[in-house]
Curated annotation (Swiss-Prot):
Belongs to the class-II aminoacyl-tRNA synthetase family. ProS type 2 subfamily. The gene is proS. GO terms for molecular function: ATP binding; proline-tRNA ligase activity. This is Proline--tRNA ligase. GO terms for cellular component: cytosol. Homodimer. Catalyzes the attachment of proline to tRNA(Pro) in a two-step reaction: proline is first activated by ATP to form Pro-AMP and then transferred to the acceptor end of tRNA(Pro). It is an enzyme of class 6 (ligase).
């Protein structure tokens, strides 16, 4: 992609309304545009990151056996009345009427709708277990939306919902999602710690929030230092092996970890002082088992092997992709801008032509752009006539993992410079070696 043809509305000054780093950098880097209180448009650079975050989520949900669907944003109030939850969200839920004067709502969550789908089609234990997920925009009328997309009124959510015959099956489904979340956040370059948490208005009796430690976090969190070095399950994890998955969950839930709401001072006192970590944290995911909370009032029953009807035992598993983008920035930035982990970077390489119009610089830049692209790399080629200092500032601000710098002196010597955005290290390489560095075949 040529920067001269790309829509990247960079802001030179820090926006006054931005209270935290991620909000400031997302506005400055031209990732988002605020359209109203707690409402944002995602511009090309931001949308690329959001899409990559969603793709990782999809891959890990699919790996764990969940199946993707898509449910509508507008829901019938009747479903929520069935579950008895219509008034639980109060003014946070946007309520509307259609032209037939029927009560509708803009869904803040989807337990009722997915339960209606389940009860319509699933009648036997032979069709279980079942885990359905979707990625959809949600709306909650926050009293005080703030921190950009970190706490907005309209946001993107991945919601998964599991259905099983009994608690034993539901616990296995919960464990699979637990491990899936560990892998998901690690792939995005985040160190997420599962902490015992309250279930809130959704209800239930087993709940974990996945928290990343950050000074700008909204929650006070407490955990054992062991969490900072625990090994995350690999890509070869067998999600069909309930015993293996349960062992992983046990390892990740044995040390103490809790949000402020669930903090147990007596248990905390038993943790050695040298192992205590007390910090602010950002919630990036929430999973919980809610049993028959929705299946019972909504009549979602299946026939068991005993020939009797059983209310399905359910769980809900949420990740906010739009919030995750901000969380990644909070965890990975410096004074010059964003530092994207490779897996979610909008482009793999920022190719900088230091002297556009110089025949040799243009030739080498075009050659590298074509070679990197052919090798499967996403390249943002800065072919603008901006000054070199401005080009470097833009590249650092938007945080691409690698910068390949093409200048007159280097080209004359048959070389280019490569900069690692995370470490700041620079290396001068022959052009052929620079190609090999990024997977271009000789």
């Amino acid at each position: 992609m040529r920067l001269s043809r790309y829509f990247l509305p960079i802001l030179k000054e820090n926006p006054r309304e931005a209270e935290i780093v991620s909000h400031r950098l997302m506005l400055r880097a031209g990732m988002i545009r605020q359209q109203g209180q707690g409402s944002f448009s995602w511009l090309p650079l931001g949308k690329r990151v959001l899409d990559k975050v969603c793709q990782i989520i999809r891959e890990e949900q699919n790996r764990a056996g969940a199946l993707e669907i898509l449910m509508p944003t507008i829901q019938s109030a009747d479903l929520w009345r069935e579950s008895g939850r219509y008034n639980d969200y109060g003014k946070e839920m946007l309520r509307i009427k259609d032209r037939q004067d029927r009560d509708m709502l803009y869904g803040p969550t989807n337990e009722e709708m997915v339960t209606e789908i389940f009860r319509a089609y699933v009648k036997s234990y032979k069709d279980l277990p079942l885990n359905l997920y979707h990625i959809q925009w949600k709306f909650r009328d926050e009293v005080r939306p703030r921190f950009g997309v970190m706490r907005s009124r309209e946001f993107l959510m991945k919601d998964a919902y599991s259905f099983d015959l009994d608690f034993e099956g539901a616990r296995s489904a919960y464990n699979r999602m637990f491990v899936s979340y560990l892998r998901t956040f690690t792939r995005m370059g985040l160190q997420a710690i599962p902490m015992r948490a309250d279930t809130g208005p959704i209800g239930g009796d087993l709940s974990h929030e996945f928290i990343i430690l950050a000074d700008t976090g909204e929650s006070q969190v407490f955990c054992h230092r062991d969490y900072l070095s625990l090994a995350v399950p690999g890509a070869n994890t067998d999600f069909a092996n309930d015993g293996e998955i349960a062992d992983i969950v046990k390892t990740w839930t044995t040390p103490y970890a809790a949000t402020d709401e669930m903090h147990d001072e007596a248990a905390w006192e038993k943790v050695p002082e040298s192992d205590k970590v007390s910090a602010r944290g950002i919630e990036v995911g929430h999973i919980f088992h809610f049993g028959e909370k929705y299946s019972k009032p909504m009549g979602a029953k299946v026939t068991g092997p005993d020939g009797k009807d059983h209310f399905a035992s359910g769980g809900s598993y949420g990740i906010g992709p739009s919030r995750l983008v901000a969380a990644i920035i909070e965890a990975s930035h410096d004074e010059n801008g964003i530092i994207w982990p490779d897996a979610v970077a909008p482009f793999d390489i920022g190719l900088i032509n230091m002297k556009v119009g110089d025949a040799d610089c243009d030739r080498v830049s075009e050659e590298l752009n074509a070679a990197f692209t052919a090798a499967g790399k996403d390249v943002l080629y800065d072919d603008t006539d901006q000054r070199p200092g401005g080009k470097f500032a833009t590249a650092d601000l938007i945080g691409l993992p690698w910068q390949v710098i093409v200048g007159p002196r280097g080209v004359a010597a048959g070389e280019v410079e490569i900069k690692n955005r995370r470490t700041g290290e620079r290396e001068t390489l022959p052009i052929a070696d620079a190609k090999k560095r990024f997977g271009v075949a000789a």
